[in-house]
């Protein structure tokens, strides 16, 4: 390829680069504004100041003195990690079973499972609250994670990825005398690391950012999560936006770290699910 052709191609790519720069700016600016607002006073934020200030420690002190920040962070980590581990185990077993075992009625059951994705969460919230209240599960980890540890989307995701798992390996393992449990844990799980990583990212972020159900089920401030804490910072009279953005920053850091660490595996797992 001649230099003239390369120059022509580069000129044609200029609009694409400009578009990507604009999209990147639109995507990154809210994150920058959140960090900047966490370092400014509420008055500066209200006036539209976008440059970083020097009031982060003041906002942080106000946040920790007025709200149980560390308790909320600990609760969110505990609920999110526990939900992720249990959800991955249950949904992967279900997705694996739907693909590997060929029983009568399997397809109908899977269709019913997919139809459950059409039911909004708010439609089942009141019945679930009454059931959990009678069972004494209010303000408990079980009450938090039970409705979300098995989601149709996660089961479908593992089911789609399980299609790439070689059936011949399963048959060979059975001939060698491996139990179904050992086949799943020693052969299926190691080959589906990307799927597990993608599912872990989605489940962790959903559990961490969950607000409506914890707000209903958690009536004790000792069980408060980070989204509930942030909601408490928004009052009907005067809202300290600097302190609010400081809380949002602490709430956002864990999910950003999880995504950045597992972004490669996340992309691979999602790609495998849509094939």
Residue ranges, per PLM feature:
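A structural signal for multi-pass alpha-helical bundles of membrane permease subunits
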Residues: 4-275
